[in-house]
């Protein structure tokens, strides 16, 4: 079958016209691919650029060692270590300068007081058992020592007795001076400092204005009416 248009003769195949629906151009028919049934695309692993970027953005949590650690992390780690050292030093200084609490001081003072009291009690018990004898001399000496100690602890020295004649003086030691008084009385002067010597005694005896004053309460009675004085001085 042929058609004549503007001087052109176009031949049309009847078989192709039956295969293709009307309204479709010959050019589209001649260049269209053979129709095949379409199936959905299967998901396949691709190596696209977007997938590479997505994988590269998610990095595993890798623990860095000291040799491959970034400089920023090293600086932060050193700064943190320095702050810890400074904080520890401040705590040590506070602990050294801090005073113990009041409760601890009270407990320690009570413990010290009880210990001192117990030690004093032990010291008092020992002489009592030692002097618990039948000897009159030991008993008298023990009683005199206790009386003298009580006087010294509770009274201040009071020089109430004056001795002007001490020409009959004998040096017993650098701490002891024996003086014979009228009426067969003998006293011994005890000096805590070793100041008694011949030159010292000669100067006192040769000085007409020198006088000896003693505290009549601070003495210890020895045998044969001899009194041992602790508080005395020359004026």
Curated annotation (Swiss-Prot):
UniProt-annotated stretches for the region Disordered: 1-47, 78-128
Record's compositionally biased regions (Low complexity): 84-98
Polar residues compositional bias, start-end: 20-33, 106-128
Record's protein name: Uncharacterized protein YIL152W
